[in-house]
């Protein structure tokens, strides 16, 4: 499946920043918004309720990683917020991921669709050197990512967060329907920031990404609405 809207990462420190940003867009335009840790820890569920009240889709990016029971109960709560997608760290293991899905299913109100559940493989800020030196995972970065993707599929999750560079091999190792959501997307000429493994929207589409996440190239642009539409157009070519 492919989401035709780029997911906008609203990595803002304050709830007011979210309101200011979304007010720039025509109310009829429904966006896909990623809300991360800093914002959720600052504003709590109210920021989710606000974004959903405007008709936008929400990916709540909290990257849960804890013992299975804690993750299960946490997912039960998150499901009640009405979000469209949530995630965990694949490093938590199959048992934890199974528990996460079970919690989501239990918490989803009757008549609503369960939020999509995906897992983080290796962060796009992680290089092979970092992985081997800091995590002591002595395989290649690609092998680690594919292993995590296979474990995620085994647990029955919907997909993974991964670099666009790994999409083709992940789908070959799992299935074409397995979701690959790719951050680290930058238009041609944009700064890479703290991302180590990046691609353009067009490259990500060509290689088979299902969702792309774009933050600063939109949120820090002089004209965020125009920047969003340009990236959306490139993504849908």
Curated annotation (Swiss-Prot):
Pathway it works in: Pyrimidine metabolism; UMP biosynthesis via de novo pathway; UMP from orotate: step 2/2
What protein does this entry describe? Orotidine 5'-phosphate decarboxylase
Q: Which residues form the active site?
A: 63
- Superkingdom, according to UniProt? Bacteria
Q: Which reaction does it catalyse?
A: orotidine 5'-phosphate + H(+) = UMP + CO2
Citing just one GO molecular function, the answer is: orotidine-5'-phosphate decarboxylase activity
Q: Which organism is it from?
A: Lactococcus lactis subsp. cremoris (strain SK11)
Q: Which residues bind substrate?
A: 11, 34, 61-70, 124, 186, 195, 215-216
Job of this protein: Catalyzes the decarboxylation of orotidine 5'-monophosphate (OMP) to uridine 5'-monophosphate (UMP).
Q: List, alphabetically, the Pfam families matched.
A: OMPdecase
A cellular component term from Gene Ontology for this protein is:
cytosol
> Could you describe the subunit structure of this protein?
Homodimer.
Concerning its family, UniProt says:
Belongs to the OMP decarboxylase family. Type 1 subfamily.
- The protein's Enzyme Commission number: 4.1.1.23
Q: Which InterPro entries match?
A: Aldolase_TIM, OMPdecase, OMPdecase_AS, OMPdecase_bac, OMPdeCOase_dom, RibuloseP-bd_barrel
GO biological process terms, semicolon-separated = 'de novo' pyrimidine nucleobase biosynthetic process; 'de novo' UMP biosynthetic process
Q: Which UniProt keywords apply?
A: Decarboxylase, Lyase, Pyrimidine biosynthesis
